[in-house]
């Protein structure tokens, strides 16, 4: 015979235990942390998409092009972002490739390998950022360039850094005769000439 009272108590206990696990995982983070991390992840998605779209539009033969001696070539611009992403992720506690500074950005000019490395670096940063607590975000760290700042500030600084190199990539693309895909789409949607 079905015992409704026993069933209801079991169901109630299961729900309480489940809620305890969910609430416990968020108890270490404030609502502000969840908002910051969510916003940060959204910004990472945006910049990753722009960088990968621009890289995809660039021809392979322009990957080794550099505007002047001693200036990063096209592939190095994207790989520099990837290397910086790994630096950021390491400060977040992620397991990242152990390399000398500057090694990743000079590792290849193969467009497919550049794209793969860039994607992997964003994945590592997103996974690490998604698990941060208030305490971790507010922790003072020493950056690779010798400055002390909170992890939160370092994350924002490296987001700015990504945008800086997106701008550099846009210039390289334009000089190479490549229209950034999102600009071309906006211009064609508004009956512009795509330039």
Where are these regions (language model features)?
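N-terminal secretory signal peptides that target proteins for export/translocation
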Residues: 1-5
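Bacterial N-terminal signal peptides
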Residues: 10-22
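Juxtamembrane cytosolic interface motif at the C-terminal end of transmembrane helices
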Residues: 23-27
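Short N-terminal segments immediately surrounding and downstream of signal-peptide cleavage
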Residues: 28-49
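Short, contiguous alpha-helical
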Residues: 41-45, 52, 62-103, 142-195
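Acidic/histidine-rich alpha-helical segments that form the ligand environment
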Residues: 107-142, 150-164
